[in-house]
Amino acid sequence: MVLDLDLFRVDKGGDPALIRETQEKRFKDPGLVDQLVKADSEWRRCRFRADNLNKLKNLCSKTIGEKMKKKEPVGDDESIPENVLNFDDVTADTLTNLKVSQIKKVRLLIDEAILKCDAERIKLEAERFESLREIGNLLHPSVPISNDEDADNKVERIWGDCTVRKKYSHVDLVVMVDGFEGEKGAVVAGSRGYFLKGVLVFLEQALIQYALRTLRNRGYTPIYTPFFMRKEVMQEVAQLSQFDEELYKVIGKGSEKSDDNSYDEKYLIATSEQPIAALHRDEWLRPEDLPIKYAGLSTCFRQEVGSHGRDTRGIFRVHQFEKIEQFVYSSPHDNKSWEMFEEMIATAEEFYQSLGIPYHIVNIVSGSLNHAASKKLDLEAWFPGSGAFRELVSCSNCTDYQARRLRIRYGQTKKMMDKVEFVHMLNATMCATTRTICAILENYQTEKGIIVPEKLKEFMPPGLQELIPFVKPAPIDQEPSKKQKKQHEGSKKKAAARDVTLENRLQNMEVTDA
């Protein structure tokens, strides 16, 4: 995932100042731009020198051939005149005045210079790439500039009643319908491990079927993706920080052959966006085939490093969940990708409106965007039991930022194009099932149970098409209130103090008696 290098090159029409400004607006290090420009300038000089050295080497070979054809003596003199040691000044006439043995010696020296130049070029290329991979995409003008997501995300619109309050949060409701095993899940899988069971399994499957059908009716091709990716491919779709904070690494044998002891390093996917982004890797996509729209279905795996203490109970924030994803390859021309961006968020809105989930759409501030996103809109549902908005959908236009590293090009082959162009790539959540279940539970709770949303009834089994009944008490009702806990703790402290006082008195009495 990278920007076009020509954007950093003034002689190619680029504007490093614009990228530096973008880095500042993202609250990232603008010095990376200067480091890249310096490394790129040196790299280009090095490549220019290597090209000239190769031309000179070819000229040496040509001159030797001509001299041999004329049957000139080879000679045994390998001394090199001073004027020849400066390769920049060597011409065909210079070489003509040398013996074949001398030209061969010059050619050997040129080979050494080329090797040295290539080593320097590779080093500079690595330095340039290290800076390039950490420089974010150019921002859309409508992105709010701030580093405070909580205070400055811009609310674009609201749908439904986002003021209503209800009694229970999803943490209690998943237990009340007997659809969740948290403690046992943690024993088996560790923190945030869980078993989804009973009615919530059917509700999850209903959401998956309804989301896939909705997207298929809008021209999306359903696609079930691999759950893990090779390291070299994941590096092309994920930014560096994700490897430490989000992705799980798995190691297995590199071959099915019993005598092969090599091991492969792979990564579990955090979203189906990652494998779908690589689906057309190294391809040319024809204009008449665009847009290509996929409805990705996958299990997603996330470490959630940095989320310690947040949403530790229930199924809202977990390490493993199912998700339906919108993913689109779009033309880079005529504002097509931005039109698609609006279409994708509208599709997500229609889905949640049809489920009767109130929400607002927020424009995410620049400092909270990942490197690839030029702009991101989130759909945050209203959770009446929790009294808060919670994110259900993220919709991003990454323009050509991802496609460039994956080499997914637009149009015909390079021979048919003046300049290579890259497709634009967009992604948007349709339905992360565990989070959507939480939203449904809170919004559709009654005294007796959870009303099944109208659109999901046909996907639910007989007996569960109208109401999911409560079969267990709410955990919060079983716990002592904070006031009761405080009073109980106070009573324990007073009792302990009385015991100490009584013991001291008894000891004093024993001393007096003695």
UniProtKB/Swiss-Prot annotation:
GO molecular function: ATP binding; RNA polymerase II cis-regulatory region sequence-specific DNA binding; selenocysteine-tRNA ligase activity; serine-tRNA ligase activity
Swiss-Prot/TrEMBL keywords: Acetylation, Aminoacyl-tRNA synthetase, ATP-binding, Cytoplasm, DNA-binding, Ligase, Nucleotide-binding, Nucleus, Phosphoprotein, Protein biosynthesis
EC number(s) per entry: 6.1.1.11
Residues at the site labelled Important for serine binding: 429
Gene Ontology BP term (one): negative regulation of angiogenesis
Residues that bear N-acetylmethionine: 1
Modified-residue entries (Phosphoserine), positions: 241
Biased composition (Basic and acidic residues): 479-502
Cross-referenced InterPro entries: aa-tRNA-synt_IIb, aa-tRNA-synth_II, aa-tRNA-synth_II/BPL/LPL, Ser-tRNA-ligase_type_1, Ser-tRNA-synth_1_N, SerRS_1_N_sf, SerRS_core, tRNA-bd_arm
Protein's UniProt keywords contain Glycoprotein: no
Protein role: Catalyzes the attachment of serine to tRNA(Ser) in a two-step reaction: serine is first activated by ATP to form Ser-AMP and then transferred to the acceptor end of tRNA(Ser). Is probably also able to aminoacylate tRNA(Sec) with serine, to form the misacylated tRNA L-seryl-tRNA(Sec), which will be further converted into selenocysteinyl-tRNA(Sec). In the nucleus, binds to the VEGFA core promoter and prevents MYC binding and transcriptional activation by MYC. Recruits SIRT2 to the VEGFA promoter, promoting deacetylation of histone H4 at 'Lys-16' (H4K16).
Protein family (similarity comment): Belongs to the class-II aminoacyl-tRNA synthetase family. Type-1 seryl-tRNA synthetase subfamily.
Protein name per the record: Serine--tRNA ligase, cytoplasmic
Organism of origin: Oryctolagus cuniculus
